[in-house]
Amino acid sequence: MTGKPAIDVISFGCRLNTFEAEIMKREAAAAGLGAADAVPAVIINTCAVTGEAVRQARQAVRRARRDNPSARIIVTGCAAQTEGETFARMDEVDAVIGNDDKLKADSYRSLPDFGVSAEEKVRINDIMSVRETAGHMVDAIEGRARAIVQVQNGCDHRCTFCIIPFGRGNSRSVPMGAAVAQVRRLVDAGYREVVLSGVDMTSWGADLPGAPRLGTLVQAILRHVPDLPRLRLSSIDSIEADPALLDAIGTEMRLMPHLHLSLQAGDNMILKRMKRRHSREDAIAFCVDMRSRRPDIVYGADIIAGFPTETDAMFENSLRLVEECGLTHLHVFPFSPRKGTPAARMPQMPKAVGKERAALLRARGEAAHAAHLARLVGTRQRILVEREGLGRAEDFTLADITVGAPGEIVEAEIIGQTGERLVTRPLMAAAA
């Protein structure tokens, strides 16, 4: 025995879950879970975005029990919060902990005994009653060259397809000082790139005194942590982007030229039925405007295929959005009805139609991505080495890289492409 707590955290879904996994492991260890003289523990940190995500979590639970017959198996995350009984009924599960409690050591100190009833396994509070999100400090993100900082949690919007507000609660912001201090701490630990993350990140600040906006936070981080080479945003809602954020994207070269947009669809009627806050014209205008400010900017987007009532013509509008917005990195999901959401009660499309349309969207996205890679051939790019042989350019494109240690930034010439990656010829280690 090495004395290191035997705790394995398996995370599904978003970057926020990845960040929270580090906190959960630390808090569970502080509570004595998985100690050298105790049984090992496996924590499954679930996602609730789609039915497939829940299925994969259940599969992970069964696999964890097969691989670790004597371990304590704990299920938490968004799917645990929204449908805890689903996991509590599984014989393999020892405890189900809600999204708020999973970040507290006390939640792991008094776990239920083996073999208790499903009701006794569940430790879930009312997520809607949570009013604050602590600025949790982490010194490292295990196995990653870039660090993630949570600045916001929850969502005040109620899109008709989305279960996440019921898994994460209403929007809460990490205070600016705590967020800046966390970035400072990670840069001091050697990280060259920090990713700001949240559930609805462009709503950051609305619940804080004075209601500051996300752009103010971004500018504060860049100002107070001048030795941070790369700051990246995760997903944003373009209709909520404030003027200070737009200015920062256009002028701050340390803010990476990659935006992942929560678009969801390209047809106005479908957007209305989704209860989104933007139109297709809004999305296109935003992308055109940002590209005029920052010509090297690259867009990713979430798009749902086969939403209830989506006709062929409506779907074509989503397909055309790839070109009209200049999208490069697509996250495509066939519509998945989530119990309790308004969209689950709408007239449903056949699953085969959703899968077929998702495949068409992915193919359109892959073609756009290949064209983007081809345009980069002959340019110079700064590559953050993620692991041996692989890194990412500033626009989040994967690149083969033959030199540099994980976490090092290397300047390289792009000499070709292979699959979804750039082929590079290293020139030198880049200065911060």
List PLM regions with ranges.
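Short, glycine- and charge-enriched coil/turn segments that flank and shape catalytic ligand pockets
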Residues: 70, 111-121, 206-215, 223-227, ...
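Proteins enriched for Cys/Gly/acidic motifs involved in redox and nucleic-acid/cofactor modification
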Residues: 1-204, 219, 244, 255, ...
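Active-site proximal loops enriched in glycine and acidic residues that flank catalytic Cys/His/Asp
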Residues: 11, 198, 235, 263-265, ...
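Conserved, mostly hydrophobic/aromatic
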Residues: 159, 196, 233, 261, ...
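Terminal RNA-binding accessory module
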Residues: 337, 345-432
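Conserved SAM/AdoMet-binding glycine-rich loop
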Residues: 73-77, 82-83, 188-312
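Glycine-centered loop/turn positions within well-structured domains
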Residues: 103, 157, 202, 268-269, ...
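Contiguous mid-protein beta-loop-alpha structural module that forms a pocket-lining wall or clamp
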Residues: 310, 325-327
